[in-house]
């Protein structure tokens, strides 16, 4: 069985080796953020969508929840920049889990006492805020069922897909 050491990015997330009984198919992973799509799964089992926008409860409460869609941003950097844009401390933002920087990802975020109208005005390169709703609860780390991954392998050897 052949063993190949993966690049640092894969080692960082726990992928320590590739194994194959055959010669392998070749190819490259994560050449573009769209090659690695990460969609958070809510505790209710809903897989977040990258594109559609679903409005929620519009009755103002303490927390605004929204879906953060980002391309090529890590979670902490995105929230730091977002906090500057809306003029509040980064500590007012909460999320269920961080997502890979070199990916196109969708994750739920909450922010305390920032109206959705202010968030809807934010324009950032490679970041979209959507699916706004109000809640009386903050998000907590780990408040998700998991993540759904879509991975594209580019440059696969001819005939390997068979």
Pin down the residues of each PLM region.
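Terminal domain-initiation and capping elements
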Residues: 1-162
């Amino acid at each position: 069985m052949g063993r190949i050491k993966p690049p640092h990015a894969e080692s960082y997330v726990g992928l320590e080796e590739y194994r194959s009984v055959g010669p392998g198919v070749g190819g490259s992973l994560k050449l573009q953020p769209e090659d690695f799509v990460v969609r958070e799964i809510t505790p209710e089992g809903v897989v977040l969508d990258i594109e559609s926008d679903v409005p929620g409860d519009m009755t103002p409460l303490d927390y605004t929840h929204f879906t953060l869609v980002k391309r090529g941003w890590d979670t902490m950097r995105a929230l730091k920049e977002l906090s500057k844009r809306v003029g509040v401390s980064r500590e007012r933002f909460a999320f269920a889990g961080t997502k890979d920087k070199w990916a196109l990802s969708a994750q739920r975020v909450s922010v305390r006492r920032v109206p959705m109208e202010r968030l809807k005005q934010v324009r950032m390169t490679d970041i979209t805020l959507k699916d706004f709703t109000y809640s009386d609860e903050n998000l907590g780390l780990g408040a998700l069922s998991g993540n759904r991954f879509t991975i594209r392998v580019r440059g696969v050897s001819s005939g390997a897909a068979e």
